[in-house]
Amino acid sequence: WTDKMKKTTTILLTAGILASLVFSGCGPGGQQIKIGVAGPLTGEQGKAGQDLLHGVQLAVSECNARGGVLGKRVVIIAGDDRADEKEANAIAQRLCDQGVAGVVGHYNSHCSIAGSRIYNQRMIPQITPSSTNPKFTQQGFDNVFRTCGRDDQQGRIAADYAFNVMKVKKVAIFSDGTTYGLGLAEEFKKSILLNNKPKKVEVTIVAEAQIPVITEGKAPDYGPLLDPLISYQPDLIYFGGSYPEGAMLIRQVKERRLAAAFMSGDAIANSELIKRGGVATEGIYFTFGPAVEDMPQAGRFYDSFKARYGELGPYSVYAYDAATVLLKSIELAGTTSGDSLVKVIHSAKFAGAMGELEFDGNGDIKAAPYVLWTVKGGEFGPVKAEVQVQ
């Protein structure tokens, strides 16, 4: 942290689970309002979790510079769920016990879904900036929201591009076996097979499998799954999963000199993908939201974030807006009561860095544009005009 950040934002962070924390004046009527942040702050996905945390830090520091909320200073309590469902449960329970007004998180869909049951029992607003699995907002919980889109949306965009632009005929589909990865791969498969019927063009799934994830830094060998593709010769390999495994899969695909194009979803959108995958990542495709630089309202956020943290994380603006919604809802409600905050979030419109934010009855963001991206010259860039999905 810079000295400036130390002065404007208080972060209480532990690895794994939150230890017992003692605050002065943090109970009812105290001078602090606590906001929880949960994600994989260490480990293979640590970069993604830190990107999320930085977005919340910026929103909170700006809020405190304006005098806080309801005349009180906002404090962040951050928990490292290590991308593990059991840790997510522990973090959720500890955040609730510490009396947070709301939570920004988690990063992974399986962690967000696991934690949501606990947050719902306490009616604490939970806003995920990155969990795209549709099931998260289909549980019948009033208190869950997301500032990102869903896998059924990005799966359809990816499939439409693969079918109509790339003209693929043979596809291999892999996932990392997580709730997110399996769900995204299934949505892509469903969408691309649906394209067969009206166009009367046959798309064949030549292979479908789960790949082992990286554990304790050990690199899995994907050879037994990839070697059969040499004879199948797919036009496209689609992967549902995150950037650590994605980078390794891409490298091993290139090592076998397979001519297939490679496509994935939002969770590989991290600079670590290019660092780990190297030149093998050149020309790969993935779905994500529009570039922050192209968002008319995001200029101030972009400049402030770059000045404080340097590199802009892919989900930092989504976390920033999630925190913005949470803080503004406290201001509008005039209280930190969960029931009141949930009602406000469902009914109000919020001005975020990404533009106007409004949620539907399930807690999904009403406008969720996706763009197809690629890697060119070692950098991410959109390859297609923005596509609005309803």
What label would you give each PLM region?
Residues 1-34, 65, 97, 388-390:
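Short, low-complexity disordered leader/linker segments with a strong preference
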Residues 27-32, 47-52, 62, 66-141, ...:
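Beta-alpha junction/loop-to-helix N-cap segments that form part of ligand/metal-binding clefts
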Residues 232, 250-320, 334, 376-389:
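Extracellular/periplasmic periplasmic-binding protein-like sensory domains
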Residues 33, 71-74, 98-102, 121-126, ...:
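Loop/turn elements at helix/coil->beta-strand transitions in domains of secreted/extracellular proteins
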Residues 95-107, 127-129, 170-175, 232-242, ...:
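Periplasmic-binding protein-like
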Residues 305-316, 327-382:
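Segments of small-molecule ligand-sensing domains
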Residues 90, 134-135, 142-255, 290-300:
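Extracellular/periplasmic Venus flytrap/periplasmic-binding protein
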Residues 36-57, 79-86, 107-110, 177-182, ...:
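Extracytoplasmic "Venus flytrap"
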